[in-house]
C-alpha cells in the first residue's frame, strides 16, 4: 500500500533562526532568493576552496543558493557543537567526497556528512553526524513541466498509474513530484545514482532497503509575492525521526 507516502506527515515548522529550538536530526529550509549577496563579505563566510566554487557560479540565484547552504550548515555546526561556537565561518569548509558520494563539512579535523537540496531558490540543509542512511529532496511543483510525458518515459508502470489516476492536473502534478522527491531522497540515502532509481518502483525499493519516508508540501512567496509550492521528502532509518524548520530570517 502506498497511501501513507502521500499523507503529508513530515513536520515543517516556520520559525526564526534566533528562536530555533533545535534538536538533532533537523533540516533547515530557507528561501535563498531573499539573500542580498552584497550584504556579505564572502572571504569571512567561505573557505578559500568554497570561494573558488562560488566564483564559478554564473547566475545570481546559483550564488545565493551556494552561499545560503554553506552558511546554514556552518550555523548548524555552531548550534549543535558548542565547542565550535567561536570558530570563524571561513575555517569550516564543505567539499564533496567522491568515495562516499556525500558532501562533507570539515571542522577542526572532524569530517561530518551533510545533505543539501535546492530548487528554484528554496534550499535545505542537514547534518548527518552518525552517517546513517538519510537523504532529503526539495522540488518545485510545476504544472508547466510535461510530467505525464516524463513519467511515461522514466517511471515504473505502477507509478504511472498513480500519476494518471487523478482527474485534475494539480493532483497529477502533486503525485508526480512526490514520487520524484522520494526517488531523489532514496538515491541520497543509499548513495545510488538517481538514474538507477528512475524506472524501479520507489515504494518497493524503500521496502527492500528497510527505510522509512515522510513528506510534505510547503508554499513560499516568490519575488512577485506569488505563492510557489514545493514538495519535500525525507528518507531515513526507521529508528530516527527527522523534522524540518522553514526559516523566516537569516544570520549575517
Language-model regions, residue ranges each:
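Core catalytic alpha/beta fold that binds nucleotide/phospho-ligands
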Residues: 1-252
Amino acid at each position: 500500500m502506498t497511501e501513507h507516502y502521500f499523507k503529508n506527515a513530515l513536520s515543517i515548522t516556520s520559525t526564526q533562526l534566533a528562536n530555533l529550538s533545535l534538536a538533532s536530526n533537523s533540516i533547515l529550509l530557507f528561501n535563498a532568493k531573499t539573500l542580498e549577496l552584497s550584504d556579505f563579505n564572502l572571504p569571512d563566510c567561505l573557505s578559500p576552496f568554497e570561494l573558488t566554487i562560488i566564483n564559478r557560479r554564473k547566475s545570481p540565484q546559483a550564488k545565493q543558493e551556494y552561499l545560503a547552504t554553506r552558511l546554514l550548515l556552518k550555523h548548524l555546526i555552531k548550534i549543535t557543537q558548542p565547542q565550535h561556537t567561536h570558530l570563524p565561518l571561513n575555517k569550516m569548509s564543505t567539499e564533496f567526497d567522491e568515495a562516499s558520494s556525500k558532501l562533507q563539512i570539515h571542522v577542526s579535523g572532524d569530517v561530518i556528512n551533510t545533505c543539501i537540496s535546492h530548487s528554484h531558490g528554496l534550499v535545505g540543509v542537514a547534518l548527518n553526524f552518525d552517517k546513517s542512511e538519510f537523504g532529503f529532496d526539495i522540488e518545485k511543483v510545476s504544472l508547466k513541466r510535461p510530467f505525464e510525458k516524463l513519467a511515461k518515459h522514466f517511471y515504473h508502470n505502477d507509478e504511472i498509474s498513480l500519476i494518471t489516476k487523478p482527474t485534475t492536473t494539480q493532483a497529477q502534478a502533486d503525485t508526480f513530484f512526490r514520487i520524484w522527491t522520494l526517488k531523489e531522497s532514496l538515491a541520497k540515502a543509499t548513495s545510488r545514482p538517481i538514474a538507477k532509481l528512475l524506472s524501479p518502483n520507489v515504494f518497493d525499493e524503500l521496502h527492500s532497503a528497510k527505510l522509512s519516508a515522510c513528506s510534505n508540501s510547503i508554499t513560499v512567496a516568490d519575488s512577485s509575492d506569488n505563492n510557489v509550492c514545493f514538495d519535500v521528502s525525507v528518507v531515513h532509518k526507521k529508528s530516527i525521526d527527522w523534522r524540518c524548520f522553514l526559516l523566516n530570517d537569516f544570520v549575517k
